Amino acid sequence: QITAREWSIPRDEQDKLAYESHQKLASAYDEGFFKDLMTPLAGLEKDNILRPDTTLEKLATLKPVFDRENGTMTAANSTALTDGASCVLLASEEWAKANNMEIKAYLTFSEVAAVDFVDKKEGLLMAPAYAVPRMLEKA
């Protein structure tokens, strides 16, 4: 909500991004993109927040969830509380070879950034906006 307000992102644009995101995710599942990237666990085989049948009209009917008076964030256009369940295992090339692990990728570039959210000088989620361009310059 804070980022949307700070950057003047209107509700309809947030809903449009949410809609497009659901459509792209549904297509990726249909095309088998995640087949070798996801491991089913406890009966869950797909992202449980995917709504492939959603429409912009349905999204527009949802009420704001954080700032009920003036807010624009809804259950559909904000990050779900269950989002973010993932795992990345990193190891040295030497260790991977010694343990007969297949090397799938190399971490070649990284960057660190922080924002001053405590004093409300910058948005909480803005660190990647600083880090990613610097990292891409290195690449």
Which role fits each region the language model picked out?
Residues S8, D12, D119-E122:
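Charge-dense, low-complexity intrinsically disordered segments
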